[in-house]
Design a protein with these regions (language model features):
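Extracytoplasmic/periplasmic solute-binding protein
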Residues: 129-137, 142, 167-220, 226, ...
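C-terminal lobe and pocket-closing loops
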Residues: 275-285, 298-396
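Short, solvent-exposed loop/beta-turn-alpha elements that line the ligand-binding surface or hinge
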Residues: 105-118, 161, 180-190, 208-230, ...
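Short helix-initiation/N-cap motifs at beta->coil->alpha
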Residues: 60-71, 90, 163-170, 246-262
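Glycine-centered hinge/linker elements that transmit conformational signals in sensory
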Residues: 171-172, 216-249, 295
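Conserved N-terminal structural module of periplasmic/extracytoplasmic solute-binding proteins
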Residues: 4, 15-94, 111-116, 250, ...
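Conserved C-terminal helix/tail region of periplasmic/extracytoplasmic solute-binding proteins
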Residues: 152, 355, 371-427
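Hinge/lid segment of periplasmic solute-binding proteins
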Residues: 89-141, 293
């Protein structure tokens, strides 16, 4: 189904703008499932009312982030990007640094955009020097979701905003059990996720990092003592303490983790804001009680987490730049942002709207995400053009440590050398 959808969208992008006369419609492309697309269509109503003679065509792509990225890069190469398109943080280097996205700064005053309204940490993701290549729409930090019922049964207090690795490990060990007495563990304290997009946040919270400042080399940072210790500790969830089930199919790790969590077989899992909508439905059905806490940090190390962001951008070679910028500005204002936040899609990038969403949320989830975001920073994917290749090497590193039994110190030294070569630090 996804392949057919991608092919269909690819054909649309390939044909868009290829006629003798430009289409009178303003085209919008974003990555969303049907529910989010329906909301986005409602958010277009005020814009359409103010521009009665202008038709707006919305296309949503229910694709994974890598699939959506390929779609954008193909459209960029063919010069067929639509008038406004969703720009994820990890696509900023490819679309902005290579000239695919328009610098919006010269158009902002005419569109009535006040950049002070946005969360400045999130806004910086779309900046390159004085240029701005996207208006931020929403963002989210990585968090830990926990099953309140499992903690209550074990008489374990819920984690605080300042909990540490030691507290996390103690709780996870207490929550790892053989519930049916058959000699095999069937309830785990934590979920081990092999994806670097998830575990890098844990390395940061341990005082380490996978790349050095500037993102041009790994040696001196990936192989630093703090990073090695953090990788050893994170991998130890499965290799030493057995507080997490061993990963099997890496391509389905997120789906399997979510299934085990909702079945009450995992107490803690690392999630982004995309988990909120699914968990809301589970909680509403009465089968699950959930809380959220920040990524725990190593004692003596400041809290840290990853921020992921989305925005709307306009193609540099677009024929309707003015209309595109106006539409992007409209869709990233406080009211649309608050609507997405209220629907559980993401935290609003407009700071005031984020506060309003958190205050209105009776579960306390949004407030927890907002507090954790105060310790967040953008991931390397928003800054390093070769991140996909770097990410693949890091995933292989974690597999060698957890599945292959490699010594973390030796494994990271080899990976650091390979990343230096990949990033051009060595020849």
């Amino acid at each position: 189904m996804r392949r057919a959808l991608a092919l269909g969208l690819g054909c649309w992008l390939g044909c868009w703008g290829c006629g003798a006369e430009p289409s009178p419609a303003v085209e919008l492309l974003h990555r969303a499932d049907d529910g989010a697309a329906q909301l986005e269509d409602q958010l277009l109503i005020p814009y359409r009312a103010r521009h009665p003679g202008l038709r707006v065509v919305q296309r949503n792509a229910a694709l994974s982030q890598p699939e959506y990225r390929r779609l954008l890069l193909t459209a960029t190469a063919r010069d067929t990007l639509p008038d406004v398109f969703q720009l994820d943080d990890v696509d900023v280097p490819a679309l902005a640094d290579r000239g695919g996205a328009l610098d919006l700064v010269p158009y902002l005053s005419r569109a009535g955009v006040d950049l002070a309204r946005y969360n400045q940490e999130v806004l910086a993701i779309f900046r390159r020097g004085a240029a701005l290549y996207g208006l931020p729409r929403g963002y989210a930090p990585l968090m830990v979701a926990y099953n309140r019922d499992l903690l209550d049964r074990a008489a374990i207090p819920y984690p605080t905003d300042d909990w540490t690795w030691d507290e996390f490990q103690r709780m996870a060990q207490l929550l790892t059990r053989d519930r049916d007495g058959d000699g095999r563990i069937d309830q785990w304290g934590a979920a081990f996720d092999r994806r670097p997009s998830v575990w890098v946040a844990w390395i940061w919270a341990g005082g380490g990092d996978v790349l050095c400042p500037g993102g041009r080399r790994a040696s001196g940072c990936l192989d630093a003592a703090a990073t090695v210790a953090a990788i050893r500790w994170y991998g130890g969830w499965v290799t030493r303490w057995a507080i997490a089930p061993r990963p099997h199919d890496p391509t389905a790790s997120g789906v399997e983790i979510a299934r085990l969590f909702t079945a009450g077989r995992i107490a803690f899992m690392t999630v982004g804001h995309d988990a909120v909508r699914a968990l809301r439905s589970q909680v509403a059905a009465g089968g699950l009680r959930v809380g959220f806490a920040p990524i725990p940090h190593r004692a003596g190390v400041p809290p840290a987490t990853l921020l992921y962001a989305t925005g709307y951008a306009v193609p540099a070679g677009g024929l309707r730049r003015k209309a595109g910028v106006e539409l992007a500005a409209d869709l990233t204002d406080s009211l649309p942002d608050a609507a997405r936040g209220g629907a559980g899609i993401e935290l609003p990038a407009v700071a005031a709207a984020a506060q309003e969403v958190a205050a209105a949320d009776t579960t306390g989830w949004e407030a927890a995400f907002l507090r954790a975001a105060g310790h967040g920073r953008s991931g390397w994917g928003a800054r390093v053009g070769q991140w996909r290749e770097v990410e693949a090497e890091l995933a292989s590193l974690m597999d060698r440590v957890t599945v292959g039994g490699a010594d973390p110190a030796r494994a990271v030294r080899a990976t650091a050398r390979e990343l230096d070569r990949l990033l051009g630090a060595t020849r």
